[in-house]
């Protein structure tokens, strides 16, 4: 599930294609059992972002290790669309742990995994944002 915080704004600079940016990352060094949390800011002219936030994890160290990389579709919570919508989506992952409310991610197993995440947002009218990438994140073995 993706928690969402949003509010309407009177600016005319919003576009039909959703705009996203990374507001924050909980940590760049994650120990096993920790939650990695991303806050993604968004704007949308029509406010119809209630479709899908896509996430891709890319390992720089062990790309062929099963489970070290993935692409995941995450449903954005349904709400009443408001023009010129601005807000924050939060998505998190439990690292090698079953944490209620979060998907689980894994790393390289026997060594640290340096990875990064890509995000893109699709709205109800099938408009897709640009793809954004996180900084490197280290999943400690």
Features from the language model and the residues they span:
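C-terminal motif of bacterial Sec signal peptides marking the signal peptidase cleavage site
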Residues: 5-8
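Bacterial signal peptide processing site
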Residues: 10-12
């Amino acid at each position: 599930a993706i928690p969402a915080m949003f509010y309407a704004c009177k600016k005319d600079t919003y576009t039909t294609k959703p705009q996203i940016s990374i507001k924050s990352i909980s940590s760049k060094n994650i120990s096993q059992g920790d939650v990695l949390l991303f806050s993604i800011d968004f704007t949308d002219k029509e406010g119809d972002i209630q479709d899908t936030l896509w996430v891709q994890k890319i390992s720089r160290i062990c790309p062929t290790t099963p489970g070290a990389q993935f692409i995941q579709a995450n449903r954005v919570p349904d709400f009443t669309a408001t023009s010129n919508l601005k807000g924050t989506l939060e998505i998190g992952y439990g690292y090698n742990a079953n944490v209620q409310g979060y998907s689980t991610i894994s790393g390289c197993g026997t060594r640290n995994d340096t990875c990064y995440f890509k995000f893109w947002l699709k709205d109800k009218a099938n408009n897709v944002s640009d793809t954004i990438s996180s900084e490197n994140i280290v999943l400690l073995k």
